[in-house]
């Protein structure tokens, strides 16, 4: 039984992390989101933080987001839920979008950052 569990653990550790290719959007303080508005995780929204919203990744997880148009990449922390627009998989803070070099929509690759 121990050997079976060990084999399963090794298989899981060797499983490559898959990229999610989709469209990213930027969301910022303004409109219905005022400075300090709490995100779904309870953390206040701040345009200057390297954060993002994702539909299913756990709060606090980190992802590497790469802009497919220019190759720029950034690591952000998931603190909110969304986006709720078909075809989009991640909403980036203004700081995250700025680091990727876009201000509206752009195609990206999203990969969870695995830490030991």
Show the residue positions of the predicted features.
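Secreted/periplasmic proteins
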Residues: 2-6, 14-116
């Amino acid at each position: 039984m121990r050997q079976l569990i060990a084999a399963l653990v090794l298989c899981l550790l060797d499983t490559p992390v898959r990229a999610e290719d989709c469209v990213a959007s930027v969301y910022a303080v303004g409109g219905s989101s005022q400075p300090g508005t709490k995100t779904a995780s309870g953390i206040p929204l701040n345009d200057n933080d390297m954060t993002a919203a994702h539909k299913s990744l756990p709060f606090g997880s980190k992802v590497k987001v790469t802009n497919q148009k220019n190759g720029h990449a950034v690591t952000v922390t998931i603190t909110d839920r969304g986006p709720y627009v078909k075809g989009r998989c991640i909403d980036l803070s203004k700081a995250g979008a700025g680091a990727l070099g876009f201000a509206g929509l752009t195609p990206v690759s999203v990969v969870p950052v695995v830490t030991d």
